[in-house]
Amino acid sequence: MSLNLRRLTLPLIAGLGLLGSQFAAAEEEIDTLRFGIISTEASQNQEPLWRPFLDDMAESLGVEVEPFFANDYAAVIQAMRFDKIDLAWYGNKSAMEAVDRAGGEIFAQTVPENGEPGYWSLLIVHQDSPLESVEDVLANASELTFGNGDPNSTSGFLVPSYYVFAQNGVVASEIFKRTLNSNHETNALSVANRQVDVATFNTESMERLEMAHPDKAEQLKVIWQSPLIPSDPLVWREGLSEPMKTRLRDFILSYGETEEQREKIAPLQWAHFSASDNDQLLPIRQLELFKQRASIAGDDSLDAEERERLLAELDAQLDDLDERLKAREAADAEQAEAGVTTAMAQ
């Protein structure tokens, strides 16, 4: 390399290095962390429940933590897609959408205060309703108003869509006299006030309703409960800087160690958090594919060859998910056994 070229090249390399370090520093120096919160109830009710926890997060991370409330789950997913929020509390269904479409990544999972490994979807009716079962609902659907959940809700939409409707060969939007989509709280209050005949709900929201509106909770009757749903995940955007991810993970996974911290998240019905990853969504992905399969299998508008092709594709995806789920369960069992062995050795 000639001396003149060297004189030109070295400052250029140094300049590029400085520019790169400035970009890295800019990435790491976040003034405000934006936390998305799905709309299980009205935002004015959620703000005071979240504020103590978010204030502790801000103090620990050394940045402002700004909550982002929206009218529906899709708005929180879209906010992550366009980098308007940095992390979010989702249900499993909305987390799946965030991971697949919005550059999200699961890093933690809530642990319920009641010690349960998850929660359950419910169908509720008014206490005085003659409806006593799913069979009663389906038999009288043409005369009933149905309060369905947000389309991106796990317990309010996906789980009942499969277990209550798809497994019985029907689609909720097609069988009722009228169908409305609302958040959990609105659905419950609508049933209590006799504005809808039957609605989706969940056990976590039922506990909150019993604390906030015990008179309304007394007006509800549960006529169906789903299989267990995994606890809710926390999701950050993949583009968040690694230093911030580390600080955030350390804060979240240690939160709940003190009595004061547990008291602050008790209104959210959580005790602490555990580490998690995108594989938490495997059972939810199975459920989504099962629902699609049931829909295709019952679609008379498809010719036989096209139906078989689509079903074969879905079956292959289900087989793959089944293998991944078995591998994860085996790894979890092995880890749990190792933990027991270590504890006994001590």
Language-model features and meaning:
Residues R34-S39, P112-L122, P214-R249, R262, ...:
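Periplasmic-binding protein-like
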Residues N92-A102, F165-A166, A192-N193, D197-E218, ...:
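A ligand-binding cleft/hinge motif common to bilobed small-molecule-binding domains
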Residues I30-A58, A70, K93, E113-L189:
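Bilobed "Venus flytrap"/periplasmic-binding protein-like clamshell domains
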Residues F68-E105, M206-M211:
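Pocket-flanking alpha-helical
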Residues I30, A42, P48-P52, R247-Q346:
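An extracytoplasmic/periplasmic, membrane-proximal ligand-sensing/linker region
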Residues A74-A88, R101, Y119, H184-A199:
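Short helices/loops that flank or line small-molecule/ion binding pockets
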Residues M80-R81, V137, V191-A192, L234, ...:
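Hydrophobic residues within well-ordered alpha-helices
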